[in-house]
Amino acid sequence: MKKNRERFCNREREFVYKFKVGSQCLELRVPLKFPVQENASHLHGRLMLLHSLPCFIEKDLKEALTQFIEEESLSDYDRDAEASLAAVKSGEVDLHQLASTWAKAYAETTLEHARPEEPSWDEDFADVYHDLIHSPASETLLNLEHNYFVSISELIGERDVELKKLRERQGIEMEKVMQELGKSLTDQDVNSLAAQHFESQQDLENKWSNELKQSTAIQKQEYQEWVIKLHQDLKNPNNSSLSEEIKVQPSQFRESVEAIGRIYEEQRKLEESFTIHLGAQLKTMHNLRLLRADMLDFCKHKRNHRSGVKLHRLQTALSLYSTSLCGLVLLVDNRINSYSGIKRDFATVCQECTDFHFPRIEEQLEVVQQVVLYARTQRRSKLKESLDSGNQNGGNDDKTKNAERNYLNVLPGEFYITRHSNLSEIHVAFHLCVDDHVKSGNITARDPAIMGLRNILKVCCTHDITTISIPLLLVHDMSEEMTIPWCLRRAELVFKCVKGFMMEMASWDGGISRTVQFLVPQSISEEMFYQLSNMLPQIFRVSSTLTLTSKH
């Protein structure tokens, strides 16, 4: 049967088309190999161009060519089917084997016969955790997480102490060498010592990095196995003592770390809250907050000082697998790493506590790098194809050079997302790429940073993120050029743009109530903060308050 099919599939036939040009009768003969792999319309266009055929036969030629291909293909299929039936009747093909092959193919391609996919370990663990965190066992879970947090904190504290001692010792050595410079030592000796110091620091940092990585991996495995076991044991009504196994362990070392500055001290926050209404026909109500705070305050682990030891993150844990997620926007440069600036500070906070649900921040960034590399490769190949096809111009040349220069980086306005379960008040971080242009005072509503905010809000609507924190001035730190008029113009622009985006959200998600938090740097003055607070009700329609008085 396969031999017959191969013979039919490789058959060549001649397409003949006759037409008149004036008094001349012309004939077009084209050999075609069946089955014809090329689209009939494309083949027709090639024939018209290759043979310089007159335009008045274009439509008739296309119809004749299409009809010829359809008729000959159908004829081949009929002959192939007849040969297959003949092979079955003659016993050349095993009927039972053929039926089994058909049944298997049908079952694999038909949904109702397909085997249901088995739930993955991550899905099972997520369901179990969601059940437990909404049960009386939630306190037990948080106590266990806190004990793991204390363990990692002590490890980080030991690392910092050892690194500090190394730097102090190296500083003393370098100071002695500098005193002998020009006497018994040369610049080469200084450079050699500096290289040794750098190598020693790298070795020590790598040692502690590997130890932290190993400790968090062990904690994650132990925690997940313990959660599954706890869920199974709680189904047994006779086992009521398991929840008493986990007790909060105090950390004396943590107190010493606090003494040397490991605990972040919060500056006094300023905060204003507003309830607003958007829309004329479909009115939606949202909550707005204006805060003077560090963006990372929503990530750093805090203690509930009244109870003494428990992490202040119960609400974050309760909503981890819910439709009410919390996110924040970090302004980063175009390099996907955690080596400098707020990216390094954010990664440091992420490392303070093991993430029991998602990959480590380093692993997530590696995945983002691979995705960006693939996307850039695809865009570059498409752009190259368009240039090779003759559509190149000066603008496209500039785009090509720009794409090559930023081949492994994200562009301004683009963002990548990381997921977290180990931060204080957020689940999702949007890393929005901005450049130095945001520090100028002449950006518009079409600026990449503003459009990036729009796309972030759209992702919030489609992925159940109901609380989002945004840097109002599109900067995390103030500088000299950011005067009061600069701040007022920037805040007005962001307020108005976010208002428009929130009105768009009503059509995206049906008008779900959301909370948007606008953050300004901690170095901003109280006077400036209250000027921004007074601006907000002028742009958004704030709900009026109703004062009730009692009659005597």
Swiss-Prot record:
It is found in: Cytoplasm; Early endosome. Pfam families: Fy-3 (PF10154). One of its GO terms (cellular component) is early endosome. Residues 383-403 are annotated as: Disordered. Transmembrane segments: none annotated. The keyword Cytoplasm applies. InterPro entries: Fy-3 (IPR019311). Keywords: Cytoplasm, Disease variant, Endosome, Intellectual disability. GO terms for biological process: regulation of mast cell degranulation. PANTHER family: PROTEIN C12ORF4. Component of the FERRY complex composed of five subunits, TBCK, PPP1R21, FERRY3, CRYZL1 and GATD1 with a ratio of 1:2:1:2:4, respectively. Component of the FERRY complex (Five-subunit Endosomal Rab5 and RNA/ribosome intermediary). The FERRY complex directly interacts with mRNAs and RAB5A, and functions as a RAB5A effector involved in the localization and the distribution of specific mRNAs most likely by mediating their endosomal transport. The complex recruits mRNAs and ribosomes to early endosomes through direct mRNA-interaction. Plays a role in mast cell degranulation. It is linked to Intellectual developmental disorder, autosomal recessive 66: A disorder characterized by significantly below average general intellectual functioning associated with impairments in adaptive behavior and manifested during the developmental period. MRT66 patients have intellectual disability, delayed speech development, neuropsychiatric symptoms, and relatively normal life span. This is Ferry endosomal RAB5 effector complex subunit 3. The gene is FERRY3.
